[in-house]
Amino acid sequence: QKKDKKD
């Protein structure tokens, strides 16, 4: 499971 972190 890959979580994309968007700032």
Swiss-Prot record:
Subcellular location per UniProt equals: Secreted
Which UniProt keywords are present, listed alphabetically?
Pyrrolidone carboxylic acid, Secreted
Which cellular component appears as one GO term in the record?
extracellular region
* Main subcellular localisation: secreted
Please list the tissues where expression of this protein has been recorded: Expressed by the venom gland.
- Where Pyrrolidone carboxylic acid occurs along the chain? 1
Q: Which family does it belong to?
A: Belongs to the tachykinin family.
What name does the UniProt record give this protein? Tachykinin-like peptide-I
